[in-house]
Amino acid sequence: MESFEGQGDSRQSPDNERGDNVQTTGEHDQDPGPGPPSSGASERLVPEESYSRDQQPWGQSRGDENRGWMQRIRRRRRRRAALSGHLLDTEDNVPPWLPPHDITPYTARNIRDAACRAVKQSHLQALSNLILDSGLDTQHILCFVMAARQRLQDIRRGPLVAEGGVGWRHWLLTSPSQSWPMGYRTATLRTLTPVPNRVGADSIMLTATFGCQNAARTLNTFSATVWTPPHAGPREQERYAREAEVRFLRGKWQRRYRRIYDLIELCGSLHHIWQNLLQTEENLLDFVRFMGVMSSCNNPAVNYWFHKTIGNFKPYYPWNAPPNENPYHARRGIKEHVIQNAFRKAQIQGLSMLATGGEPRGDATSETSSDEDTGRQGSDVELESSDDELPYIDPNMEPVQQRPVMFVSRVPAKKPRKLPWPTPKTHPVKRTNVKTSDRSDKAEAQSTPERPGPSEQSSVTVEPAHPTPVEMPMVILHQPPPVPKPVPVKPTPPPSRRRRGACVVYDDDVIEVIDVETTEDSSSVSQPNKPHRKHQDGFQRSGRRQKRAAPPTVSPSDTGPPAVGPPAAGPPAAGPPAAGPPAAGPPAAGPPAAGPRILAPLSAGPPAAGPHIVTPPSARPRIMAPPVVRMFMRERQLPQSTGRKPQCFWEMRAGREITQMQQEPSSHLQSATQPTTPRPSWAPSVCALSVMDAGKAQPIESSHLSSMSPTQPISHEEQPRYEDPDAPLDLSLHPDVAAQPAPQAPYQGYQEPPAPQAPYQGYQEPPPPQAPYQGYQEPPAHGLQSSSYPGYAGPWTPRSQHPCYRHPWAPWSQDPVHGHTQGPWDPRAPHLPPQWDGSAGHGQDQVSQFPHLQSETGPPRLQLSLVPLVSSSAPSWSSPQPRAPIRPIPTRFPPPPMPLQDSMAVGCDSSGTACPSMPFASDYSQGAFTPLDINATTPKRPRVEESSHGPARCSQATAEAQEILSDNSEISVFPKDAKQTDYDASTESELD
């Protein structure tokens, strides 16, 4: 493809460039045809001639090259001049050859909109589905749409039989995806562009895209050849951005200037446009103005476009005729000074003139008015009609189209989703105006139909669908008996409030009247005191959940004013004794104990305040709701202890059972008849938690398995955890936990680990170490001063707080070992035995796992986790200055006398051995830092990735250097690996 610089301009290009003189070579006569990518024209043009040239001696061939070079330059110039025609006489001037079809490079937007319009046609549905559903980019959309167009053309004109007898190509295709309505596959092929007589054919890449619809995935499908634009590199993207900016500016210009822009882009020859393509004098003056704007324009994008298009960086003005020739505008009757004035005015006005039109026209009509040219010359019809063949169709020139119907993102109006729980929408409830002693009764009485008021026990029982054999008192709302007798009732409807989650609470779960033996003043079942429940209940945090925590239970005294209202039940602990902890109003009434749950006194806090409730034997636990519902309901009827708020459901449940057992120790005989909830079979094993406060919690003594005392402050988060996530796995050895008593037995067969000793009073010799995991460090004695023994480097923090070791379950080894260790992220990290140095005995080089046990003689090794993160500074608080590198790096040189804390010092190779990385062993620091050992044995050279650092130094270069240096008499022994530095040519021994 001939770029705008002209491929022939570079001396490196082969002699016959692809666009230049292809007519003379007969290689293009047969079509490369289908199949594997054949070597295109560019490979077959050059070889014979270049081989013959290579046989000649160098000087002669170079002279030929120069001569051929100038010949080619002249031929190129001649060809360009012949195309543009401005060097020939004006009589036999022939317009340049143009392709026979309209040059209309569609923008990608036009094609995409066409694809969207193709949705309406049934036979193109699959293609548009593929384009629009799979989120493709514009390039793929272009490929698919052109594939469809090519396929339709093939079908319309039948099998195309070329000269070589090549018909349609077809492939067997399978879809890569199991879920698309239309699979596709592509294959690529390099061919030549179809130009007449194959003159100037470009070698291009064709991509055949095959589609198959609706799971018919193995079909013979005919290919459609699709031109895939090559992926643009950064320079091309820059160029595209410039061109796009120019097109955007062009869209703002007036139509006459847009037309001149299009003519220049189409022809590329200013002379040709000036002499052949401008009909009227006004058009000629417009062209002059356009040239004036271009000559003074400082917009880089427009400059780039203009010079690229005319192929020249010094624009020539076609009205400046050669001196022996009558200029064209004079023959058209335009005076020279008119042209000069128009040119200078446009130069002064600049780019803005193209949009506003400037004064010469006199009217500032908008660019869309099509009578701009025809209003002044009515005869100029062919100019207007030529607007259809403009080479670029800008979206601004066309009527605004609606967004394709595909992209309307509105969800289709279908039936609302069937929710798995009853909602006021799915199960409308009859509304009644029941007076409840609720603080929200006003809001509920005036509630809209979307949020209906409290539901009475109506006969419309749609849900719950599960069988509800209920034995529970019938609650008649208006004239209730003072003590209602338990009569079986029909299941009550779902609550009328709108439920916003899966937490279903039915009214019949809550409305339940209990036989009460008590004084008359509290014989009326009153409401849960919602204002005070707010302070107590750890669960109902938000007002909305609190409001729907327990639907209003109907008290027998609802016809009159409530017997004990919210004011009567005082603050949580300071009410009358009959008003107990206000979890449920006066404890005599208790909160309505929800059916399958405990009918035990729910209001019975740790002090047994108020009379004791005896549940009638007739009130057996109902099988009311599925277990999930029970789980969520139990949340709402937990006892309100005066201690710390329980923070998770299992704590609350366990606390309720504890208080139950504490309060009535004699009720164990009665508990067979008492309907305490059987522990559901679906209860997870989370309730077997060890309840150990991280502070000063005592292990809890309780007879129940899952019990947690709500009176003890338990500082755990709300979700149950199996251990303190900050602690390492071995709780008995962790220094933070060692001072605490043994935790509560977490499961039943649990043997208690041996209790650790009290913290060290002085330094004791530790027993022979049995490390629980590799590299575990025992905490040093607390009695010692911080530098009392060598290598001690300050108190240990819990390792989970160290920023490098956030993962306590798979820790690093604590000591820097040689070789590759799995990081803490690897779940399969093997727990290796402690690895030592290469030194033979347990001498001074042994990397000690216990820093306080180190021999005084050995150089103290810094523990890795004690080194601060800025590794370039040695830790200032370690008593002896370390005389070794931070991590022992196996290099081919002996360890230097001073620590090499160079930022480039350590690199880990993916092969597993820690070896000096490229910069360390390279020319930057080789001479500067490393003391060379000339007589050292030379190990194998470290692998160097060629990709990351550019091409690695090739071994032959090293070999050459070695030969050169071994010939040198100065250096008799030279290590194989050592390279000369780039910055001075001195050898390593001189640097030493």
From Swiss-Prot:
Report which residue ranges the record marks as coiled coil. Answer: none
Q: Where in the cell is it found?
A: Host nucleus; Host nucleus matrix
Q: Where is the composition biased (Basic and acidic residues)?
A: 12-31, 715-724
> Which InterPro entries has this protein been placed in?
EBNA-3/4/6
What GO terms describe the biological role, i.e. biological process, of this protein?
Answer: symbiont-mediated perturbation of host apoptosis; symbiont-mediated perturbation of host cell cycle G1/S transition checkpoint; viral latency
Where are the compositionally biased (Polar residues) regions?
445-461, 659-676, 700-714, 845-857
Annotated spans, 12 X 5 AA approximate tandem repeats of P-P-A-A-G: 551-610
Q: Where is this region: 3 X 13 AA tandem repeats of P-[AP]-P-Q-A-P-Y-Q-G-Y-Q-E-P?
A: 741-779
- According to the UniProt record, where is the region Interaction with host PIM1? 130-159
Bias regions of kind Pro residues — which residues? 479-495, 563-594, 882-899
Output the Gene Ontology cellular-component terms: host cell nuclear matrix
Q: What does this protein do?
A: Plays an essential role for the activation and immortalization of human B-cells. Represses transcription of viral promoters TP1 and Cp through interaction with host RBPJ, and inhibits EBNA2-mediated activation of these promoters. Targets host chromatin through interactions with host transcription factors, especially RBPJ and IRF4. Alternatively, EBNA6 also regulates the transcription of the EBV oncogene LMP1 in a cell cycle-dependent manner.
- Protein name, as recorded: Epstein-Barr nuclear antigen 6
Look up and give the organism this protein is from.
Epstein-Barr virus (strain B95-8)
